[in-house]
Amino acid sequence: MARRSVSIFNRLLANPPSPFTSLSRSITYMPRPGDGAPRTVTLIPGDGIGPLVTGAVEQVMEAMHAPVHFERYEVLGNMRKVPEEVIESVKRNKVCLKGGLATPVGGGVSSLNMQLRKELDIFASLVNCINVPGLVTRHENVDIVVIRENTEGEYSGLEHEVVPGVVESLKVITKFCSERIARYAFEYAYLNNRKKVTAVHKANIMKLADGLFLESCREVAKHYSGITYNEIIVDNCCMQLVAKPEQFDVMVTPNLYGNLIANTAAGIAGGTGVMPGGNVGAEHAIFEQGASAGNVGNDKMVEQKKANPVALLLSSAMMLRHLRFPTFADRLETAVKQVIKEGKYRTKDLGGDCTTQEVVDAVIAALE
């Protein structure tokens, strides 16, 4: 033991730490005993560009020696249901990383994304639409978090043909789910030092359904006096987003509105290819690209292997924080943003012509 101590001491003398090392760190992260144990994460590569971008994440995780092991399952959007073993895997592991799953337009195949959310009660979708240093956009100072109810609303999947040529689609809003998503939005704002929560609605027309959603948000807002609460009609919200997006902070929405607003805000802030996101419930979480806007089915992008991996890499940083691996998360996020800021390695959607692999190699080289 004494010899080993001398050896370590000699190595330190030969390679003294930089006097600036401590300046680059925050106050020490003190893990709890056992926090470094490797975690198993369910991996669903998905359709289209999914295998490309999830493969990018696997490479970067391996390069970082992150304590994460992936349990891979092949799930495709044209399946009639999510295989039971996949559901059991997510229930067991608590966390899933997912590429995009295509949902056929029309026909009798239901969305596997909705099946996963309902089966696992993953009720909140979160998309962080924020300007990324180095990407030139029309608007600056955009930092919007869109929190969307994930399990009901227009996406309940309750549709039927009443008589030939007449289809009825039901929008379901409940007090329980509305209060739950409102509580999550305010809790997120409180824990992340956000100053304002905006509820998005169409209660001027859908007076009962969206009226119940607003009533629930107002009830929850009473318990967070330090956070400003306001409301905006969804069509006005869309106009305000493209005119003055910096006015928004946290937005809480029913299902359909949140999907549209998140993709719009992502486009304003720099593009869907760089916006991270995740879905969370009381027991489970699924991390994926924050806003997809049709990238899943881009066959040309798949053939050329030029899918942008940035959004899923940043979503993976969110996942690492969720797993309580904050240092690995910081390293990954810093490396990705450094590559974007330098501007040398970018895919076509960001003004470059790089392949997915070239971006991945640049991120790995930038890891500290």
Curated annotation (Swiss-Prot):
The answer, when asked if Methyltransferase is one of the entry's keywords, is: no
- What name does this protein carry? Isocitrate dehydrogenase [NAD] regulatory subunit 3, mitochondrial
Pfam families tied to this protein: Iso_dh
Please give the organism: Arabidopsis thaliana
Annotated Gene Ontology cellular components are: cytosol; mitochondrion
Q: Which GO-annotated molecular functions does the record name?
A: isocitrate dehydrogenase (NAD+) activity; metal ion binding
The places in or outside the cell where this protein is found are: Mitochondrion
Q: What does this protein do?
A: Performs an essential role in the oxidative function of the citric acid cycle.
Traced from the root, the source organism's taxonomic lineage reads: Eukaryota, Viridiplantae, Streptophyta, Embryophyta, Tracheophyta
Q: Where is the transit peptide?
A: 1-26
How this chain assembles, per its entry, is: Heterooligomer of catalytic and regulatory subunits. Interacts with 14-3-3-like proteins GRF1 GRF3 and GRF8.
Keywords noted in UniProt: Magnesium, Manganese, Metal-binding, Mitochondrion, NAD, Oxidoreductase, Transit peptide, Tricarboxylic acid cycle
Q: Which residues form a coiled coil?
A: none
| Gene Ontology process terms (BP) | isocitrate metabolic process; tricarboxylic acid cycle
